[in-house]
């Protein structure tokens, strides 16, 4: 009687350092994949505009039949980059939308707009392993005018890990520099937008950094 083979479940997580080619392991004939593209940076601001939050990276899930030893091209998107597995591609900026930053002079002061939530990899099939959505949008920066109207908050980043937009104090008769948006903190998240600057000579605010993507390969192999 032949001994039973042990079957091992694998969730293989790839980063940009793994870019190149991935070879199908021995005994593997089906692979379920989740691709998350990189999130976009939040926008800069100036004395006319608040920065919008960066859009999150797109999320793509699928299953393919494979054969051992066959190689597939792998590109894990860094910030603002697409993620690719073979012929499949998740697009940067196609995830949760970033919160809009109010544009143009002459608007009323307002808080930043929130970013949209991301999406669950594998359609939330494995919530114990991947409990949070990926590819959230960043929040927009606050829009102020220098009218002594108090503090305006930045938009909340989308769930999970979108960068928050920058808030700012609306104070009169001073130069107010734009403030930096918050950095994204989870796969595919967009950065937060910068708050609007006020008065001539004010410096622009910088948008927060997006977060890189990830590729996850799920398969069963012989132990």
Where in this protein do the model-derived segments appear?
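Enriched but not universal
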Residues: 1-32, 63, 214-223
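Low-complexity, glycine/proline-biased repetitive segments and flexible coils/loops
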Residues: 32-223
């Amino acid at each position: 009687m032949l001994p039973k083979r042990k079957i091992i479940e694998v969730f293989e997580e790839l980063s940009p350092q793994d870019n190149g080619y991935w070879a199908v392991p021995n005994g593997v004939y089906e692979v379920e994949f989740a691709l998350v593209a990189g999130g976009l940076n939040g926008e800069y601001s100036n004395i006319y505009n608040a920065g919008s939050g960066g859009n999150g990276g797109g999320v793509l899930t699928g299953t393919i039949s494979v054969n051992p030893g066959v190689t597939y091209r792998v590109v894990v998107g860094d910030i603002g980059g697409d993620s690719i597995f073979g012929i499949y591609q998740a697009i940067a900026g196609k995830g949760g939308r970033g919160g809009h930053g109010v544009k143009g002079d002459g608007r009323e002061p307002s808080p930043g707009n929130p970013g949209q939530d991301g999406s669950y990899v594998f359609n939330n099939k494995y919530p114990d392993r991947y409990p949070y959505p990926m590819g959230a949008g960043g929040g927009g920066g606050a829009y102020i005018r220098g009218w002594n109207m108090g503090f305006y908050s930045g938009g909340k980043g989308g769930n999970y890990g979108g960068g928050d937009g920058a808030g700012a104090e609306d104070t009169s008769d001073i130069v107010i520099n734009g403030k930096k948006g918050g950095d994204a903190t989870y796969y595919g998240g967009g950065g937060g937008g910068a708050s609007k600057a006020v008065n001539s000579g004010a410096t622009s605010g910088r948008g927060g950094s997006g977060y890189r993507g990830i590729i996850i390969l799920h398969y069963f192999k012989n132990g």
